[in-house]
C-alpha cells in the first residue's frame, strides 16, 4: 500500500510540501448523477422549477465549488485554476441529471479534488433547487474518471464502471 503523504512521522495531519515538484499541465474530470422522478426531471427539462434555471444555476455553483475547494477541504492546496467546465445532462434513463466536471491547471499538484468538489456542488445545487418538488432525490456515483499530469501520470476509470 502506498504511503499516505498527508501524515508526518508522528502521524499528525499536515499539508504536503509540493515546492520541489515540477509545474506541469494537469487535468481532472469527475462525474456523478442525481436521480429523481420523471415528473421532477420534467420540471428541469421544461424550465418550470420554482427556483428558476436549475441546470444554469447548478453549473455556476459547480464552478464556484471548484474555486473554493481549498477553503472546504483542509489539506488541499489553493491552486491557480485555469479552466472549470461543468456539464449537466438530463437523462431519462436514470431518470435524473448526469454531471461531469473538468478542471485544469498548470501547477505542482493535481486538481482531482477540485473536479470532485465541482461535480458534488453542482449535484447539491440541483437538489436544493428541486427539493420543494421532491425530497427523495438521490445523489450518487461521485468519482474521478480522468486524471492526467504530474509524476503519477495518467489515470482513466475503467470503461463500464459508471452507473
Swiss-Prot record:
Keywords: Lyase, Molybdenum cofactor biosynthesis. It is an enzyme of class 4 (lyase). Pathway: Cofactor biosynthesis; molybdopterin biosynthesis. GO terms for biological process: Mo-molybdopterin cofactor biosynthetic process. Substrate binds at residues 75-77, 113-114. Coiled coil: none annotated. Pfam families: MoaC. Its EC number is 4.6.1.17. The active site is at 128. It catalyses: (8S)-3',8-cyclo-7,8-dihydroguanosine 5'-triphosphate = cyclic pyranopterin phosphate + diphosphate. GO terms for molecular function: cyclic pyranopterin monophosphate synthase activity. Homohexamer; trimer of dimers. Catalyzes the conversion of (8S)-3',8-cyclo-7,8-dihydroguanosine 5'-triphosphate to cyclic pyranopterin monophosphate (cPMP). Belongs to the MoaC family. This is Cyclic pyranopterin monophosphate synthase. It comes from Jannaschia sp. (strain CCS1). The gene is moaC.
